[in-house]
Design a protein with these regions (language model features):
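Short, low-complexity, Lys/Arg-enriched N-terminal segments of secretory-pathway carbohydrate enzymes
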Residues: 1-35, 66-80
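Mature N-terminal, pre-catalytic/accessory segment of carbohydrate-active enzymes
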Residues: 21, 31-38, 55, 66-68, ...
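Hydrophobic membrane-insertion alpha-helices, especially the h-region
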Residues: 39-53
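Membrane-interface motif at the C-terminal end of an N-terminal transmembrane signal
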Residues: 49-70, 79
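Accessory carbohydrate-recognition regions in carbohydrate-active enzymes
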Residues: 86-483, 487-530, 536-605, 617-636, ...
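ATP-dependent phospho-/nucleotidyl transfer catalytic cores
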Residues: 610
Length: 852
């Protein structure tokens, strides 16, 4: 249902009586009054009919606000009664976000939906939070932070660890807010902080402190969260509100005790019992007890602490221990407290004001009749002093809770409003703008503003250093499309993000694969090569090109330590940095041997692509001999093609075939046969020409091998058009866009993977996709909507995608004109897109010859 940005609806005429003529009035006046009354009646009847039609189309099935909210706000509601529809909105409130995918509306104070933003209004922060199993969920949470924020704050309904997020929309209790650094559902948490408020008895145990809520009381957006928690019938309620900046959470608690003698309190959990995954299944978890410190300062009216929780520390433990890693926090309160204590291993210790150890929390109690408390929680990876400084810089005491959501919303609006759409249904707008928001979360900021300039904790050096740093790099996923999307919509960030991975190379010896504070060795390939090639190709500034080439060259020519000893299996613990595991035999044989290394088929194909990316970098840097060698090596994919089966297949070190089912990462031999994004003409020739290739694609799709939940499938529908079958690209891209994405909590068919799933949708909605991202080109598909306009912040120019009829189901392209000139090529270089202009697509309901 549509998001409505309206002022409170005024009372209808039925709520007021219209006075008749008083006694003794003359009949002409009475007649005039009757005529006037008739005119007024006709006018208001017409108005009511008009209002009914609008409301019926927009507000259908919206429930009224809960009755206890009426009591709490104590403001009186205006009401309009239209047929069977009742809509109650308190003065000063709007429908700030009306669609959570659960059929319920949400109201919000107007101050929290400012500034006006079409893009922000359509974001459903619960999209991607559904799914009964980790791999059936988008792994998203209703978090609050600005784009690329260091710490995301979210209500916590469950304890998070690898394979579990801290919030699930099926839960009925909230256990507090958590400031989280968990970048994806299959990655671990690093240094969280939890805060919880209640009435009466102080309870710190996670399960016992949970408070029930009603889903209709919940309001969530990228910049503000609100809910009403029930402490108990004889105890009272707590209204919780939360916003955040990059490094500071801003929380307000409004206490409504059933008795004046009941005191409110706030708990801050610094260390907890959590879990480490030893293996690749959720049941492979074992308990893990991080260390923590807590201090309740009655004089400064602060609570301070730190913990060293890193759930992924076992993956590259010996080489990159990051022994001094700590996440620090400082909490400041708007109201004075005179009592406090700690909880150690579940035991409450009143008046003990500091402690260190496992399963540790601190708490403060407020005097009776304390109705409202604001808390500012600064977070830092540098020090307690820096956590305090972050509060001063981002949310000083003079800043109200209304100002923080407005500031954060403004940052989201600056990005989301770059996109405008015409002809899209409300559900499509929710998918589109939520996808946009999902692409702007990772990687997240690690660097912090200090008196000495920008600094960050380096897990590689295990100390604080100067510079810019990001974490949460899921490069195996995001190199495919999310990186290209950020070049379009966040170019001011990209140079720093590339410099960050170069810093990782300088500090840790290698470019990252999957960085979560430090390298984790998750996934395969050295796809940072592609990020660098792409950035160089489009002319991104802000990073050292020479150092970047040195890093890429090392990836391409230097095997990792113990390369001939280890298999480097998925989530194998205590290994050195993996990078291109199996590079020793890849250089010798042309492929990674399956009897020597895990995931060998995927590695071989990924390394071939990475050689292609490295060759682009070498060309740009003038290293012609290296470029020629790498370009030749990029054809190593041919070593895996089995002419007898017509599929790619992993091989053993003696040259024998390993079997079709062995050696793959998040895919099968069908998907990986098509995993040659950089040389599609060569692959088509290898498979016997376009006709055979298209037949293989048909069987791949029709037999259910294209699992869009896994990234190796993302480019595959765009391969049809490269084999002169454009209509099949147009059909399958549209079908995937409709089947694997929707506006509900179950709106993602698989893990979001740090924005890659959403980047696919955004590009596809525009009618193009970066099949070969390192080369900075786009393969054309067909737009989803009648008109889509993207403003490019680097130039201020607009790319107008016009495709009349696309919104009503026309998916076939008859012709494309760019700025009035016919465009026949199905591949478009980045510089054409960067120039802006009008892309006029002529759409039809049956397939055409364009693109053949």
């Amino acid at each position: 249902m549509a998001v409505i940005r309206r002022r409170p609806i005024t009372p209808s005429i039925s709520d007021h009586s219209i006075p008749g003529p008083s006694a003794g009035q003359r009949r002409p006046q009475q007649k005039l009054w009757r005529r006037s009354r008739l005119l007024l009646f006709l006018f208001f009847s017409a108005s009511l009919f008009w209002l009914y039609n609008i409301a019926s189309s927009v507000f259908e099935n919206l429930p009224s606000l809960a009755s206890r909210d009426t009591q709490r706000f104590n403001e009186g509601f205006t009401k309009i009664r239209l047929s069977d529809l009742e809509l109650d909105i308190p003065p000063g409130y709007v429908i700030g976000h009306a669609d959570f995918g659960d059929g319920r509306s949400r109201t919000c104070k107007k101050e929290f939906v400012q500034p006006q933003s079409e893009g922000c209004n359509w974001v459903n922060v619960n999209l991607g939070n559904g799914g009964s199993e980790p791999n059936l969920s988008g792994g998203m949470i209703p978090s609050v932070a600005p784009p690329f924020g260091m710490t995301r704050w979210t209500p916590q309904t469950r304890e998070n660890y690898v394979s579990m997020c801290p919030y699930n929309q099926t839960d009925t209790k909230i256990h507090g807010f958590i400031g989280t650094h968990q970048p994806a559902i299959w990655m671990g948490e690093s240094g969280p902080v939890e805060i919880h408020a209640s009435l009466g008895e102080v309870i710190t145990d996670f399960e016992k402190r949970g408070l029930t809520f009603k889903r209709e009381d919940e309001y969530a957006s990228p910049n503000y969260y609100r809910n009403l928690l029930d402490v108990g019938k004889d105890i009272g309620d707590v209204e919780i509100e939360m916003s955040a900046t990059s490094r500071v959470g801003h929380i307000r608690y409004t206490f409504d005790p059933s008795s004046e003698s009941i005191k409110p309190h706030v708990v801050l959990q610094t260390s907890r019992k959590t879990w480490i995954l030893h293996g690749d299944q959720p049941d492979d978890k074992v308990p893990y007890y991080p260390n923590g410190y807590i201090e309740v300062d009655l004089e400064k009216q602060e609570v301070r602490g730190w913990n060293d929780e890193r759930q992924d520390h076992v993956l590259v433990g010996d080489e990159l221990p990051a022994k001094n890693f700590k996440s620090y926090f400082v909490a400041r309160f708007s109201q004075p407290f005179s009592e406090g204590g700690i909880s150690h291993a579940g035991k409450i210790q009143p008046n003990v004001l500091r402690g260190q150890g496992k399963v540790l929390a601190g708490y403060v109690q407020f005097p009776e009749n304390t109705k409202e408390v604001e808390v500012r929680v600064g977070v830092s990876f540098i020090s307690l002093e820096q956590a305090s400084r972050n509060i001063d810089l981002e949310i000083p005491s003079s800043q109200s809770l209304a100002q923080t959501p407005q500031s954060t919303r403004s940052q989201w609006a600056d990005k989301l409003d770059l996109l405008s759409v015409e002809g899209a249904a409300p559900s499509n707008l929710t998918v589109l703008y939520t996808s946009f928001a999902h692409t702007l979360v990772y990687p997240y900021e690690m660097s912090e503003p200090t008196p000495q300039g920008s600094m960050y904790y380096s897990g590689y050096l295990d100390k604080v250093v100067s510079g810019i740093s990001y974490s949460g790099y899921s490069i195996w996923d995001t190199f495919r499309a999310q990186s290209a999307w950020l070049i379009l919509v966040a170019p001011e960030r990209v140079g720093g993000m590339i410099q960050s991975i170069i810093q990782d190379y300088k500090e840790g010896g290698w470019l990252p694969m999957w960085k979560n504070v430090v390298e984790t060795n998750i996934m395969v390939g050295s796809h940072a090569d592609s990020l660098i090639a792409q950035a160089m190709k489009v002319g991104v500034k802000g990073f050292d090109y020479q150092e970047a080439w040195q890093a890429v060259r090392k990836n391409a020519f230097t095997p990792p330590d113990r390369d001939t000893e280890l298999r480097f299996a998925d989530r194998e613990e205590g290994t050195p940095q993996e990078v291109r595991a199996g590079l020793t035999e890849y250089k010798k044989l042309g492929y990674v041997a399956d009897d020597l290394h895990s995931e060998s088929g995927s590695r071989t194909l990924d390394y071939a692509y990475d050689d292609h990316a490295a060759a682009i970098v070498a060309d740009i840097m003038g290293a012609t001999e290296d470029a020629a060698l790498l370009r030749e090596r990029s054809k190593n994919y041919k070593y895996l093609y089995n002419n007898q089966t017509g599929h790619m297949e992993a091989r053993n070190s003696d040259g024998s075939w390993a079997g079709q089912e062995k050696g793959w990462t998040e895919g099968d031999h069908w998907a990986y046969t098509l995993d040659v994004m950089h040389d599609v003409p060569g692959l088509i020739d290898l498979m016997g020409g376009e006709s055979n290739f298209v037949d293989f694609l048909d069987r791949h799709f029709e037999r259910g091998h294209n699992l869009h939940t896994n990234e190796p499938s993302h480019h595959i529908p765009y391969m049809y058009i490269l084999a002169s079958a454009p209509h099949r690209t147009q059909e399958w891209v549209r079908r995937i866009g409709e089947s694997d994405y929707n506006h509900t909590a179950d709106g993602l068919s698989g893990n979001e993977d740090c924005g890659q799933m959403s980047a696919w949708y955004l590009f596809s909605a525009m009618g193009l996709y970066p099949v070969d991202p390192a080369n900075a080109t786009y393969v054309l598909g067909a737009p989803f909507f009648d008109k889509l306009t993207l403003t490019l912040p680097s130039t201020g120019k607009n790319v107008e995608i016009k495709a009349k009829g696309a919104s009503s189901g026309m998916k076939y392209v008859k012709n494309l004109q760019i700025d009035g000139v016919d465009h026949e090529d199905v591949v478009v270089p980045h510089d054409v897109l960067e120039k802006g202009g009008v892309w006029e697509w002529e759409m039809r309901g049956d397939h055409q010859v364009w693109g053949m």
